[in-house]
């Protein structure tokens, strides 16, 4: 079989277009075949439509707690972005490798896969697990199947390392992400008859304005979490759609919004304030004109915050492997908080820089791939000599 370097494996994985709206099965089937050629059985956990799959595999003994190397296989779209190279035809230029997913986050998965032969040869006393998910970029949907699979493993892993891009710094805390869609249902009429219509767009604007007030409250009141940038919970409206024509009072308007929560804060507080304002202030004005009006808010996704666990097995191990005694905090979300909620100590540490994620001409410094390789080689040394 072909032996891959971490760089070569990264190029191979980036060549798969695994944009979240499509399938990741070509990549998963490649990884499964690669592992099978090494004598490693992989468990695939499919979505309901069988169009996507998670991969879970174990190298080493199955009767002692191990370390999970976790990564997502999907990437964000390239539509409308001005790329100077083909996004799924990775190109090396100087010290950088360009392509969608190079930083976020196929390099980590690739390095783990490339080192699988070395893990086998090391005769591990502590297992190393691969957990590669789908649909992280659209709400961490796939990882829940991996969590269900973990619940069947005895004993549970001792630690999870999520390889999102951190410049190989150890991250023990990140914000939670809570996403919603609010739909305002008004009453349609001719634009000259504003007294009989209920303008869904204008009432939606009031709700968006209130979210701006909540965002300002967070910024002004919460400024003590200096590990984060920015050091407070943020509120953001991403998209809004409504109306059909200038001379029609719009019947419908919807907007998608989120808040990114500092770990430890009440995750429902902002939603409750927003819901109370919608029900007690805005909706009564709408119903004065028509009882057919409504305001409906639905949750689109929840990414649990990663809560600091000083001296946890995951933090202790990752710091040793990275050669540091300092842990960082980040404002973006990962699957890490979900693993942590399932009872497994978790940190985030992987190659690449988050500032490159989701951008045109995404790239990773090849030095980062090399640093990840050394990090995982040290993990192999530890796993070959320690069982607890």
Q: Each predicted region: which residue ranges?
A:
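Metal-dependent amide/peptide-bond hydrolase catalytic core
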Residues: 1, 48, 181-388
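A structural signal for short hydrophobic beta-strand segments in well-ordered beta-sheet cores
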Residues: 57, 90-92, 237, 339
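Acidic-glycine-rich active-site phosphate/pyrophosphate-binding loop
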Residues: 78-93, 157, 172-184
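Short beta-strand segments
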Residues: 70-72, 131-133, 160-163, 183-185, ...
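Acidic/histidine-rich catalytic neighborhood of metal-dependent amide-processing enzymes
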Residues: 105-179, 388
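N-terminal helical capping/dimerization or prosegment-like subdomains
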Residues: 1-79, 95, 252-256, 273, ...
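Active-site metal-coordination/substrate-binding segment of hydrolases
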Residues: 66-129
């Amino acid at each position: 079989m072909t032996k891959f370097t971490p760089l070569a494996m990264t190029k191979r994985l980036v060549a798969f277009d695994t944009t979240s709206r499509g399938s990741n099965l070509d990549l998963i089937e490649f990884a499964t075949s690669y592992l099978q050629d090494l004598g490693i059985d992989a468990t695939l956990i499919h979505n309901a439509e069988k169009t996507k799959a998670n991969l879970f595999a174990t190298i080493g003994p199955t009767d002692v707690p191990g370390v999970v190397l976790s990564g997502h296989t999907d990437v964000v779209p390239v539509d409308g972005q001005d790329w100077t190279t083909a996004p799924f035809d990775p190109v090396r230029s100087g010290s950088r490798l360009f392509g969608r997913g190079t930083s976020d986050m196929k390099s980590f998965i690739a390095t783990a896969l490339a080192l699988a032969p070395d893990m086998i040869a090391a005769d591990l006393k502590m297992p190393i697990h691969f957990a590669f998910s789908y649909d992280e970029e659209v709400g961490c949907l796939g990882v829940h199947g991996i969590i269900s699979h973990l619940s069947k493993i005895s004993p549970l892993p001792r630690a999870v390392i999520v390889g999102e891009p951190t410049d190989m710094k150890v991250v023990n805390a990140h914000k939670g992400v809570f996403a919603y869609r609010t739909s305002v249902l008004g009453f349609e009429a001719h634009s000259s008859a504003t007294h009989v219509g209920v303008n869904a767009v204008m009432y939606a604007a009031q709700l968006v304005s209130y979210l701006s007030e909540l965002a300002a409250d967070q910024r002004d009141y919460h400024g003590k979490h200096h590990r984060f940038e920015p050091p407070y919970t943020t509120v953001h409206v991403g998209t809004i759609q409504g109306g059909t024509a200038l001379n029609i009072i719009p019947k419908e308007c919807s907007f998608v919004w989120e808040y990114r929560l500092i770990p430890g804060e009440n995750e429902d507080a902002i939603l409750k304030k927003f819901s109370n304002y919608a029900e007690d202030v805005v909706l009564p004005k709408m119903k004065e004109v028509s009882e057919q009006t409504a305001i409906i808010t639905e949750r689109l996704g929840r990414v649990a915050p990663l809560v600091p666990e000083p001296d946890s097995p995951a933090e202790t191990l990752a710091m040793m492997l990275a050669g540091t005694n300092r842990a960082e905090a980040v404002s973006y979300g990962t699957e890490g908080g979900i693993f942590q909620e399932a009872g497994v100590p978790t940190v985030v540490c992987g190659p690449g820089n988050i500032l490159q994620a989701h951008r045109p001409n995404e790239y990773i410094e090849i030095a980062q791939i090399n640093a990840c390789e050394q990090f995982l080689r040290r993990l192999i040394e530890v796993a070959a000599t320690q069982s607890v």
